[in-house]
Amino acid sequence: WIREELESGLTLVLLPSLNLLSQTLKEWESESEGLNWICVCSDKSVAKDEDEWVVNASDLGISVTSDVDEIQDFLIQTPNGVIFSTYQSSPLVAEAQDSEGVPHFDLVIGDEAHRISGKVSTAFACVLDDQQIRANKRLFMTATPRILGLGAIKQANNENIDVACMEDKSLFGDVLYELNFSEAINRDLLCDYEVVVVGVNDPMIQSEIIRNSVISTLSGNRIDSQTLANHIALSKAIKDYSLKRVITFHHGVKQASNFCDHHSEIVNSFNNQSYGDMEVQTGFVCGDMPSTDRNIQINKLQTKGDEVRILSNARCLSEGVNIPSLDAIAFIDPRKSVVDIAQAVGRVIRKNDIKSHGYIILPVYLGNSQD
């Protein structure tokens, strides 16, 4: 929309993942006629961080390139073209521009721009340097601005670490438009949400363990009280609020996998917490799974039916995943990152035709010493 309003010609769209690149390209194609585009990305350039959503370029189902000469030819020959690229591959675009006669961009769009903020990296900060990527205008967009505190900036300066701050107007410019969650909800752009804190105390757990021998049902694996409380809290929220589609977030990939493997077994071992006749299906995804396996699990959340579907992950579903059918998310393990929390919440407040609220489930284990 903004490209059309500005009547921009040559445009660069930067995104942090191949998955989000693919989604964005499809949206642009559906809304544009005669769009001339090229995708710049490389498997080698994609970060392999903890549970990042990693997709092989060959799995995108579209033509991609990492050839600088091909990128350069596109820049010269397609004055109204659009280059879609990951931030990680943006140095290839800069290299293609670094020749006489290669035009600058009319517009550069940096999506999920909070990923640029922080410690400067060669790839992600490339777009901030007009000597590398030449452009008339730059537009940065994010749902979760990442503002560095004075203490963090001072420490970085003391350690001679270059940082990019979103509040630095010389890098990111002025704020053009801001829309917060509450206003978006009031304008019916997002659905409202409700935070559900589910407390489970120690006597509840101990009495059920004694009565039902939960430990022995788990093939000899010992399960601590906190983990048991998390399972009970989730099942209680699902039953109390009639939830059908739920994503759980965990500290790590192993914890997410274990939760998926044992959830139904644990819950159904507790007389008072059992799902009873309810059909409950669990699944698990992580960043380095084959894309076909991941997509199967995601698509299950988008099907209609009365069965309960729970999909566990560490963080690969936090950013750039659109599942309007989602009823709830559950933070099974505590989260400290404000950006990670906001991104995860963003998954459950997407509107659909029948959803009035999204639910954010926070299990709380109350041990013997807690009230």
State the predicted function of each range.
Residues 1-3:
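Motif I (Walker A/P-loop) of helicase-class P-loop NTPases
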Residues 7, 14-16, 21-82, 92-95, ...:
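Conserved C-terminal RecA-like helicase domain
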Residues 17, 84-89, 112, 141-145, ...:
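A short beta-strand-to-loop transition that corresponds to the Sensor-1 phosphate-sensing loop
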Residues 63-67, 101, 115-129, 152-167, ...:
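Substrate-gripping "pore-loop 1 plus following alpha2 helix"
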Residues 87-89, 98-140, 144-147:
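SF2 helicase catalytic motif II
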Residues 116, 286-371:
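Conserved RecA-like P-loop NTPase helicase motor core
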Residues 127-134, 147, 152-194:
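Conserved P-loop NTPase catalytic core
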Residues 169-254:
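Conserved interdomain linker/interface between the two RecA-like ATPase lobes of SF2 helicase motors
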